[in-house]
Amino acid sequence: MSVVNSILDQIQLPRMVRVRQKFDETMLDDIPGEVVRQLSRTEIASQIRPGMTIAVGVGSRGIHQIDVIVRAALNYLKACGAEPFIVPAMGSHGGATAEGQREVLANYGITEVSMEVPIKSSMEVVPVGVNEDGFTVYIDKNAYEADGIIVINRFKPHPAFRGRYECGLMKMLTIGLGKQQGAQVCHTEGFPKMARNVEMFARCIIKNTNLIAGLGIIENAYDRTMELHGLTSEEILDQEPALLLKAKKNIPTVIPTRLDVLVVDQMGKNFGGDGMDANVTRRFLVPGMEPDPEGPACVVPLSLSAESHGNAMGIGAADTTTRRLFEAMDFEATYPNALTAALAGSVRIPMVLDSDKHAIQAAVRSVWGADPARLRIVRIPNTLHIEQIEVSEALLPELRDRDDIEILSEPYAWDFDASGNLF
């Protein structure tokens, strides 16, 4: 790409400054103890009987200390005399294969050895009913055949739709336990109707299965557990909307807005369903989601996390990227996710450049009317961990006097290696 590289080498990048963004730091000190306190509520504990088999649904998200949370729940159930086992509840993730979903759990330290319970991973589903709109509703066969079901998930705004129930326990029932087939049916009408479908499908599951409870997690902006909520099936229906609103107030944001370029060191399924959380990037993939006027002109992901196992869902939100990321993509892992979600645009390939430097320079070149002396650039590690970020020198005047920003360094040049990469 000698011609391309010669064009890009002329583009100057501004000096950067490291800053700390300050958010609410409230967090739980005793996570295992709180898990037990929530599950031992009379409304939940009264449903757990000695000898009953309980399927515990665990998803694919990079939830902080999810292994600790799951282990505490399993230990409590065993102490009650129940016989719990784990079911991967992650729709079509893990390449839509049983072994792939088992591997996703293993990435989070969740294995049969570490949890001391069986993991029943299968893509086989059974119909549990027909919802109000006439759609057949499916859930994991192993979960359906258990004496009871408990699901564990984080409350969070969804990057592709808005509604009373977004990412949380209702969606875990519908999409997670629905596996590939159930998730595909729920996505049939696309994201404009997803809010209604998640609710209608989940209500059908609650009505026709032995759902004991859900364990809902609210994280602070630093990816730490802020609250845990053990909810019965009826409480999920009634209380999840308010808990979602609380979660929305605590999601991290990139404080500088109207950027020319947002550089994301790493994208991946462990950071969000679309690889880069649109609630952070302000770059939405779904038709019908209004473009955010505060969003960046260009988005540049530099690499794909190992935890994604090649699933680059969300790469379609990028304007440029690196050959390193492109070569890490596994289309067999990526395309089932996009097809299940009926979002072909989410996996469109952006311009691929040889190095981090050239990918960033290509993005700068693509910004219409950008002032080279006042380029607004932010670099973040990923969309889940954005406490410490880098900002271009031109952003300092508007950030320097803010109470929620701490300047950590003097301006410095980008630290590219001999190959033009940052890491």
Descriptions of predicted regions:
Residues 226-279:
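A conserved active-site cap/scaffold subdomain adjacent to cofactor or substrate pockets
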Residues 282, 288-423:
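C-terminal non-catalytic interaction/assembly regions of soluble proteins
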Residues 100-164:
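An acidic, phosphate/nucleotide-engaging active-site surface
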Residues 1-33:
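N-terminal amphipathic/basic leader segments beginning at the initiator methionine
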Residues 64-83:
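Histidine-anchored nucleotide/phosphate-binding helix
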Residues 39-55, 78-79, 256:
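Glycine-rich phosphate/diphosphate-binding loops that line cofactor/substrate pockets in enzymes
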Residues 135-225, 230-235:
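Divalent-metal (Mg2+/Mn2+/Ca2+)-assisted nucleotide/phosphate chemistry catalytic cores
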Residues 53-62, 85-90, 378:
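Short glycine-rich or small-residue beta-strand-to-loop segments that form or flank ligand, phosphate
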